[in-house]
Amino acid sequence: MKKLILFELRKVFSKRLALIALIGIILFSALLSFSTFQNKYAFDQNIGKGTGKTAVEIDKEIAAKYEGILTDKKVQQMMSDFAPTSDLHGLSAIYVYQNAMQSAAFSRFSDKEGNWNGLSVSDVFGNEEIKIGYVDGWLSTSRNMVRVFVALALAVIIMLAPIFSGEYEGVDNIILTSKYGKTKCATAKVVAGIITAILTTTLIAAFNLLLAFVFYGTEGLDCSILFAPSDYVEAFIPFNITCGTLLKYQILLAFTCTLSVTGITLFLSAISKNQIVALVAAMAIFLFPVLLPITEVNPLFRLVGLLPIYHVLAISLLSVEQMSNGMLYAIWAIPAALLFLGVGAGISRRVLAKPQVS
């Protein structure tokens, strides 16, 4: 069985389209991370301004000045330090960007002229204890991971679509089933598909984390996502979790997504005699839920949000609920993924083990 699984894995990774998809994801990750890093901008009237690496260093230096638990005293200090020194020409100070810390402070505690709006920390965050620091780099990584993991799911579909349906177009199935039996061959394909999804997801997640460590260091992983610059979607998650926790959930959801689409793709590959049909159908099923007129506030989203596409569009699913044990509702993606994988793998194994004769 081990040799048969290795044989199936070699078949998956030796296909030109699969290699192109995998290399494409790696290059896309590198390009996205590098361009995000290079486009960083920060300004401070005492330190100076810069882009790219210089901007990151400026943001880190500013964050170090205020890091720790957010207090009303720190808010007043930031409002004073970052007060506009020139005419805003009608622009609201709430949306003016100087640096990451200034943007986080002004988007919550400033009026449109750049003065304190009268709100306290408890007015904005309730009884939550908000730890602040340099979070810009990790939130950029989180935002990029959404795009990367969507592409990853599509790549897994491309890699696995031919795993069963491709056998109808060749003689491999006849040779292997005569030697090992239909059940063993079907099981080997299912196991190879699961291993492919796990290995590919691990590789891409590790590569993106490595890039983040290289570009931004380790600062800020223990800081809250709630005190983030105004342009981050992560700020819409209404729960006081750290950047590290956010990334852990995202990577977990990347695995649940790829395992879910593995089950779907195995099923479609097994029932289809044409790998192109299996590929298109799997992609359509994966992407279709985003077209449904169901918003995050709709009670039905608690079910729709457990479909694979929303695992990687993580922000919506992570915003649903924080349960009494402190875990987020998104953890239900694990049993959902096991259901997709179990049903898809089970049916596809039966289809190949007992093919219908037309």
Describe the role of every protein-language-model region.
Residues 72-110:
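Extracytoplasmic loops/domains of multi-pass membrane proteins
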Residues 16, 183, 275-277:
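Residues that define the loop-to-transmembrane-helix transition and helix capping
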Residues 2, 18-21, 257-265, 317-358:
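Alpha-helical transmembrane segments of multi-pass membrane transporters/translocases
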